[in-house]
């Protein structure tokens, strides 16, 4: 399992590492110290397993294709926004618009969610 410390490499570094994996490879990643940063693990287009250890900000896992993302904390606005396939599991609560424009995949929220959850799913 590759460990990505967001505090050290930033959101761009984390997302670049996730995007650099070829579409046909399945790898495991653990993201540490998300500290409520926005746009973590967005645009993944490979069957990755991603564990985010902590709370995330807006749009975590947005535009997901194929990846399994587990968030061990709460998520801000728009988690799983425009998800095409894959799986996102939030172990805490989410803000509004969770999975609002998802076209596929599965979004699981163990806690509570706010308004507009799945409002425009296809």
Residue ranges and their predicted role:
Residues 1-122:
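Long, distal/terminal scaffolding or interaction modules
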């Amino acid at each position: 399992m590759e460990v990505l410390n967001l505090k050290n490499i930033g959101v761009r570094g984390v997302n670049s590492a996730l995007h650099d994996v070829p579409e046909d490879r399945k790898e495991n990643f653990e993201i540490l110290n998300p500290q409520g940063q926005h746009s973590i693990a967005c645009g993944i287009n490979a069957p990755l397993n991603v564990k985010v250890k902590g709370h995330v900000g807006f749009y975590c896992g947005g535009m997901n294709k194929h990846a399994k993302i587990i968030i061990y904390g709460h998520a801000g606005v728009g988690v799983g926004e425009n998800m095409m396939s894959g799986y996102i599991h939030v172990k805490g609560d989410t803000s509004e618009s969770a999975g609002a424009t998802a076209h596929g995949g599965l979004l699981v929220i163990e806690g509570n969610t706010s308004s507009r959850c799945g409002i425009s799913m296809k």
